[in-house]
Amino acid sequence: MKEKLKWAFILDKDEFVRLSLNKILKKYGFQTEEIEDFSQLEKRKKDVEGGMILADVEIDVLEKDFAFLKRWCDRFILMTPLVSDELTLRLKKMGIHRIMKKPVDPRLLRKVVREISFPNGVKAPSFGKKGEGSHFIQKGGEVV
């Protein structure tokens, strides 16, 4: 059986962030692609099925595109410069549990990615031992 590629789709306006995430995720064994908006994922459904999405978008954009994104909530990481209790609550109600404070710490990203469950036929990144817990939320410098 042919092994499917692990895709990581990156949505961020900051070119430096995109370049950094590309480099980090390629090191972790992902094929990466930068996207400008969620509509680009519509054409790539099969790749998204076996991958994950990292995005820095406003909550309003997430709510608008939620019907489309709902099926990937378990492999969606929201990156944001400001993590508040209100934001965390709104995202949890939507089914999004992975929130990372920007700038993204590569070691924390590795922990978060390690906890993602990829579908059958998609080889998950091999990072060694699996950590505890299933979801990470970074608030300030701490992981909650």
Spans of features found by a protein language model:
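Conserved active-site segment of CheY-like receiver
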Residues: K13, M79-V83, P103
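Two-component/phosphorelay signaling modules centered on CheY-like receiver
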Residues: E15-E33
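Acidic, metal-coordinating helix/loop segments flanking the phosphotransfer/catalytic sites
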Residues: E34-M52, D60
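Negatively charged, flexible loop motifs adjacent to catalytic sites
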Residues: Q40, L62, L82-E86
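Short amphipathic alpha-helix used as the core "switch/output" element in two-component signaling
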Residues: E42, V61-D74
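Alpha4 helix (beta4-alpha4-beta5 surface) of REC/receiver domains from two-component response regulators
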Residues: T80-I99
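C-terminal output helix
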Residues: E86-L87, V104-V113
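CheY-like receiver
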Residues: N120-V144
